[in-house]
Amino acid sequence: MANFVLKAEKREDLGTGASRRLRRAGKIPAVIYGGEKEAVSVLLDHDKVLHSTEDKAFFSSEITLDIDGKQEKVIIKALQRHPYKVKLIHADFMRV
């Protein structure tokens, strides 16, 4: 079983315009939800996530997100892709 660790940063700017700027800068907006905690908006490096998705185990394995130095165990619930480009648009993670 593969061990997936991704670095993430908390997002302060929310909304469509902010998300577009992040995507142009090579980042993916994402949200982490579930459990007793509030939902958290984060951003991930596009190329690292895209590389991880090439392994089919990514979609069924527990993923460790390193959010500003704090570890969080999650699974991926949704991954939005661009219709014809090899680009990721958004990711949803659920806490384990």
Curated annotation (Swiss-Prot):
Q: Which family does the record claim for this protein?
A: Belongs to the bacterial ribosomal protein bL25 family.
Q: What does this protein do?
A: This is one of the proteins that binds to the 5S RNA in the ribosome where it forms part of the central protuberance.
Q: How does it assemble?
A: Part of the 50S ribosomal subunit; part of the 5S rRNA/L5/L18/L25 subcomplex. Contacts the 5S rRNA. Binds to the 5S rRNA independently of L5 and L18.
A GO term from the CC aspect:
cytosolic large ribosomal subunit
Q: Which cysteines are joined by disulfide bonds?
A: none
Question: Which keywords fit this entry according to its UniProt record?
Answer: Ribonucleoprotein, Ribosomal protein, RNA-binding, rRNA-binding
> Which Gene Ontology molecular function entries are recorded, alphabetically?
5S rRNA binding; structural constituent of ribosome
Any one GO BP annotation for this protein: translation
Name of the molecule in the record: Large ribosomal subunit protein bL25
- Upper classification of the organism: Bacteria, Pseudomonadati, Pseudomonadota, Gammaproteobacteria, Thiotrichales
Pfam families in the cross-refs: Ribosomal_L25p (PF01386)
